[in-house]
Amino acid sequence: MNFETVIGLEVHVELKTESKIFSASPNHFGAEPNANTSVIDLGYPGVLPVLNKAAVEFAMKAAMALNCEVATDTKFDRKNYFYPDNPKAYQISQFDKPIGENGWIEIEVDGTKKKIGITRLHLEEDAGKLTHSGNGYSLVDFNRQGTPLIEIVSEPDIRTPQEAYAYLEKLKSIIQYTGVSDCKMEEGSLRCDANISLRPVGQEEFGTKTELKNLNSFNFVRKGLEYEEKRQAQVLLSGGEILQETRRYDEAANKTVLMRVKEGSDDYRYFPEPDLVALHIDDEWKARIRSEIPELPDARKKRYVEELGLPAYDAMVLTLTKEMSDFFEETIAKGADPKLASNWLMGEVSGYLNAEQKELDEVALTPDGLAKMIQLIEKGTISSKIAKKVFKDLIEKGGDPEEIVKAKGLVQISDEGELRKYVVEVLDNNQQSIDDFKNGKDRAIGFLVGQIMKATKGKANPPMVNKLLLEEINKR
């Protein structure tokens, strides 16, 4: 029997407001435990929440960027549950009137494009963070309590773990472009739960779903779903039954582990939040927020191809993160050739960042520095090979490329007379290579070029070396 996989994702995104959603407490990551709290966050008796307008506008902007319909009338509700990181014993969320509904984003997997629906986007407050220290007790940090969140719930349109990965990458990219969140999973500003079920191919009715938690990276989401897909198929093929349960992904063992079995759907006893009035969002407000949405990744990708002449692959890679795309924009604004700038960012820059596990804002390289280095290559002052030495200094220490070239004596040798001396000397010592080349062995010329580059410590102008080599060989 063949099965079809059905996946839905729930993504929580912390909004990058200065203060929390219902209090004036600072909304900054990295403070000492329980430093960014107030009596409102901690649920003291008699205190009242005040809605943060910036959080509403950030949620509106995200909803619009995700092609959602923004509600004209919305409200907040109490979601009731007991847990140590929830001091009020309820969470202020949105139940039946979310701020955004019926959205979609387009993903691409293996060259095939597909729309993934978004059921809803709603605003809510985050809970605190528990740290299980062992020895029979846990610690709770309420700094995160009251942080504004949007929860984005996808339609069950995702059919493979690869599509889930692509959806998350695209969602993160769009949200980052709007500026409403930095979406840093390592800081908890983007978190994801996944629901997965299997059904026989052709069956309309969904199978029993399993919820996956502890998915700390997009790669873990993909791996967790791949494992769960195989596990459920094995259970069904052996005549077993899938239970509605919550499982966590164990990255060390690369498998999912049972957390708890769900007897039925959770009953949170939602009811309207009595301390907050309903929210009306008029057309003028919506129009203002829509006008503030910047160029999004798909539009920027299209512009890179149509106006800058970049290959579609380059445009896709460059626009995947706003940080990289903005860096590229600034580099070409400083005069760098778009294709050369793209090559360096996708090659040497990305390679260095991946190897060092760093972000662009954590290195010394600037768009101005990269642009000037590229211009030195274009002018023939340095070769691409020498540029890699300059680049290492630029990304680790910064500075002016021209000054680095002068200080290290890296100026490319382009004087024909000087180069010809090296060419003649190498040819005098390598008669066999000359004979090989004349006998049709084209690789011999590569060897001779290599010898000249070695003699000049990589500073010879490659096109000129090739030209002079052919001239001198033809004389012999």
Swiss-Prot record:
Task: Reply yes or no: does the keyword Disulfide bond apply.
Answer: no
Against SUPFAM superfamilies, the record matches this protein to: GatB/YqeY motif (SSF89095), Glutamine synthetase/guanido kinase (SSF55931)
Please list the reactions this protein catalyses.
Answer: L-glutamyl-tRNA(Gln) + L-glutamine + ATP + H2O = L-glutaminyl-tRNA(Gln) + L-glutamate + ADP + phosphate + H(+); L-aspartyl-tRNA(Asn) + L-glutamine + ATP + H2O = L-asparaginyl-tRNA(Asn) + L-glutamate + ADP + phosphate + 2 H(+)
Pfam families tied to this protein: GatB_N, GatB_Yqey
Q: Name one GO molecular function term.
A: ATP binding
* EC code: 6.3.5.-
Print the keywords alphabetically: ATP-binding, Ligase, Nucleotide-binding, Protein biosynthesis
Question: From which domain of life does this come?
Answer: Bacteria
A single GO BP annotation from the record? glutaminyl-tRNAGln biosynthesis via transamidation
Q: In which family does this protein belong, per the annotation?
A: Belongs to the GatB/GatE family. GatB subfamily.
* Subunit structure, interactors included: Heterotrimer of A, B and C subunits.
Q: What does this protein do?
A: Allows the formation of correctly charged Asn-tRNA(Asn) or Gln-tRNA(Gln) through the transamidation of misacylated Asp-tRNA(Asn) or Glu-tRNA(Gln) in organisms which lack either or both of asparaginyl-tRNA or glutaminyl-tRNA synthetases. The reaction takes place in the presence of glutamine and ATP through an activated phospho-Asp-tRNA(Asn) or phospho-Glu-tRNA(Gln).
What is the protein's given name? Aspartyl/glutamyl-tRNA(Asn/Gln) amidotransferase subunit B
Which organism is this entry from? Halalkalibacterium halodurans (strain ATCC BAA-125 / DSM 18197 / FERM 7344 / JCM 9153 / C-125)
From the UniProt record, report the name of the gene that encodes this protein: gatB
